[in-house]
């Protein structure tokens, strides 16, 4: 009897010991696994965040340093997990390096070639179309592209629109009553590849009322001089116009700049564009703008504009989209940096997939543009 009791105690103790060992081993494995993942879970264990993604901007953007403020409109999650800096000391610890195409020089190129880091992506950021991007021959230097094109590694558009969860309240009468002028064209660059100047001047000859402003015509609005006007003066100046010319300096794949987004957005005008295909390919609602190439000739286009100008019901059809969609405030294209942070966070503590552009010029080439459009109307 006594022997049986001792045997039972021994078996019970052995069972408890085995269970304890399994629990400790399992717990230890879980801790080690979570350490490898950079995260701790459980009771009194300290929560440890994955280190922030560090994006080093090796060049400025048109001489203006690119800093953390570029993330100001990103989600809080992204802002808390990412840092953007132009501090040269971050080069050895950076998770990515960004170069703006118009600000790269031979000195920088030589340094970063000589001191190449193969564990992180070198990123070419180009917001201009191929005619103005300023690219020279970069062979086997860049790993990722960050441009306005949807097929970029990082899509970096000038603007975007999102569908509203709840239909917005739109005061159509207020919009109509604020419109006292027909069409505005504010333009600075006269060196366009697509003959936009000639097309606009032809429209005027056909009877379209267009007010011309900007460096090209050496005329600035007195109440809102370029870069010197009071805050909000641009909205006040543009808002009375029913339409605004939004011709880009080249007709290129996916190339839609702030010329379009601001006019449709904060200015509440109807943008006039050259060709519908570029905008439709981006999924922009057809009713947000008017395209010249919807008409067989300029006479019919001008007739349509004149008809819509004097007809409230017809004009307001171009504002119906405001109930369903809203334009995202892009703040000069920071959408791309939000997406870059998100993508890099997914690669944190992993090897970034290896990829290199053998010849970047062949990717960002003028073959993605068609500047012959206007000639059929001239």
UniProtKB/Swiss-Prot annotation:
Inhibited by Cu(2+) and Ni(2+), and to a lesser extent by EDTA, Mn(2+) and Mg(2+). InterPro entries: Glyco_tran_10_C, Glyco_tran_10_N, Glyco_trans_10, GT10-like_C_sf. N-glycosylated. The keyword Membrane applies. The chain crosses the membrane at residues 8-28. Glycans are attached at residues 44, 88, 105, 143, 171, 307. It catalyses: a beta-D-galactosyl-(1->3)-N-acetyl-beta-D-glucosaminyl derivative + GDP-beta-L-fucose = a beta-D-galactosyl-(1->3)-[alpha-L-fucosyl-(1->4)]-N-acetyl-beta-D-glucosaminyl derivative + GDP + H(+). Optimum temperature is 23 degrees Celsius. Vey low activity at 37 degrees Celsius. Its cofactor is Ca(2+). Pathway: Protein modification; protein glycosylation. It comes from the Eukaryota. Its EC number is 2.4.1.65. GO terms for biological process: fucosylation; protein glycosylation. Pfam families: Glyco_tran_10_N, Glyco_transf_10. It is a single-pass type II membrane protein. Residues 1-7 are cytoplasmic. One of its GO terms (cellular component) is Golgi cisterna membrane. Keywords: Calcium, Glycoprotein, Glycosyltransferase, Golgi apparatus, Membrane, Metal-binding, Signal-anchor, Transferase, Transmembrane, Transmembrane helix. Residues 29-378 are lumenal. This is Alpha-(1,3)-fucosyltransferase fut-5.
């Amino acid at each position: 009897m006594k022997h049986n009791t001792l045997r039972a105690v021994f078996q019970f103790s052995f069972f408890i010991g085995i269970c304890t060992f399994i629990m400790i081993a399992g717990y230890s494995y879980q801790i080690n696994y979570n350490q490898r993942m950079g995260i701790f879970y459980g009771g009194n264990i300290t929560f440890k965040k994955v280190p922030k993604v560090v994006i080093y901007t090796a060049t400025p953007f048109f001489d203006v340093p690119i800093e953390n403020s570029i993330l100001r409109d990103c989600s809080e999650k992204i802002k808390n997990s990412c840092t953007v800096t132009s501090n040269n000391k971050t080069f050895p610890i950076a998770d990515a390096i960004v170069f703006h195409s118009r600000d790269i020089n031979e000195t920088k190129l030589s340094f970063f070639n000589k001191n190449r880091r193969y564990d992180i992506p070198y990123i070419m950021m180009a917001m201009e179309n191929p005619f103005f991007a300023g690219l020279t021959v970069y062979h086997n230097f860049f790993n990722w592209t960050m441009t306005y094109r949807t097929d970029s590694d990082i899509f970096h558009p000038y603007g975007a629109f999102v569908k509203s969860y709840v239909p917005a309240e739109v005061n159509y009468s207020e919009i109509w009553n604020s419109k006292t002028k027909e069409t505005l064209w504010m333009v600075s660059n006269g060196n366009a590849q697509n003959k936009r100047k000639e097309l606009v001047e032809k429209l005027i000859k056909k009877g379209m009322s267009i007010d011309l402003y900007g460096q090209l015509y050496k005329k600035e609005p007195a109440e809102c001089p370029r870069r010197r006007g009071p805050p909000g003066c641009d909205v006040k100046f543009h808002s009375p116009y029913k339409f605004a010319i939004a011709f880009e300096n080249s007709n290129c794949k996916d190339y839609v700049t702030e010329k379009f987004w601001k006019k449709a957005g904060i200015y509440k005008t109807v943008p006039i564009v050259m060709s519908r295909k570029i905008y439709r390919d981006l999924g922009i609602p057809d009713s947000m703008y008017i395209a010249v190439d919807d008409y067989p000739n300029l006479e019919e286009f001008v007739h349509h504009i004149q008809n819509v100008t004097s007809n409230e019901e017809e004009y307001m059809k171009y504002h119906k989209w405001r109930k369903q969609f809203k334009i995202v405030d892009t703040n000069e294209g920071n959408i791309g940096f939000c997406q870059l942070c998100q993508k890099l966070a997914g690669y944190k503590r992993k090897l970034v997939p290896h990829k290199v552009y053998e010849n970047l010029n062949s990717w960002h080439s003028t073959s993605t543009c068609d500047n012959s459009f206007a000639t059929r109307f001239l």
